[in-house]
Design a protein with these regions (language model features):
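Short strand-turn-strand beta-turns centered on an Asx-Gly dipeptide
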Residues: 15, 43-44
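Short beta-strand or tight-loop elements
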Residues: 4-6, 45, 82
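Hydrophobic/proline-rich hinge and linker segments of small-molecule sensing/allosteric domains
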Residues: 39-43, 60-62
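DPxDG-like acidic metal-binding loop motif
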Residues: 1-38, 58
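Short beta-strand segments in beta-sandwich/barrel cores
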Residues: 38-40, 129-130
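An extended, acidic
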Residues: 48-167
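A short, polar/proline- and glycine-enriched secondary-structure boundary/capping micro-motif
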Residues: 31, 44-45, 51
């Protein structure tokens, strides 16, 4: 449909830890990168996640799921009732990098493939965002769900999503 929101993502994993990552947006000529413990960059300039403190004022993105273990419909309705600013871009790897750069304040997804999130998640973490699975465990790497956001809204976002997860 001519919607130019996609990326190329690569990462290196040692044991169960992502140690380096790159997410490339070829349309905008942007390269997000990170090394574990080394911060995150956009086109070789340091980036940081936003300082957003309120979930109601946050810009959020999500990945829809039809999996029976997560009631996406009820979750989305609950968050919509809070009048949150939400969107689905269709490219979770780029959305995660956007959290690291402060363009988005939070992202969550269920029924995802680790290959779609590993690089972007490290960039978000190294940019200062918090990352976990839907149960709040920071070891999201072995699961199929993720919550990433700025530190100040993380607990509120997780609390809004968690009741609809049956895992």
């Amino acid at each position: 449909n001519g919607y130019p929101h996609f990326s190329i993502s690569l990462c290196a994993k040692i044991d169960d830890e992502i140690v380096s990552a790159v997410v490339i947006d070829p349309i905008r000529r942007e390269e997000f990168s990170a090394f574990a413990g080394g911060g995150a960059n956009l086109n070789n300039n340091k980036i940081r996640s936003s300082k957003q403190q309120s979930l109601i004022d946050a810009m959020l993105s999500f990945k829809k799921s039809k999996d029976k273990n997560y009631d996406f419909g009820k979750s989305h309705k609950e968050l919509s009732n809070q009048n949150l600013n939400m969107r689905e871009s269709g490219c979770i790897s780029l959305d995660l990098a956007y959290v690291g750069a402060g363009r988005l304040d939070g992202v969550w997804g269920y029924d995802i493939n680790i290959l779609d999130i590993a690089a972007g998640a490290l960039i978000a973490q190294e940019g200062g965002a918090l990352t976990s699975n839907f149960l709040g465990d920071p070891k999201y790497i072995n699961g199929n769900n993720i919550v990433v956001s700025t530190a100040k809204i993380y607990k509120s976002l997780l609390k809004s999503i968690k009741p609809y997860f049956k895992g």
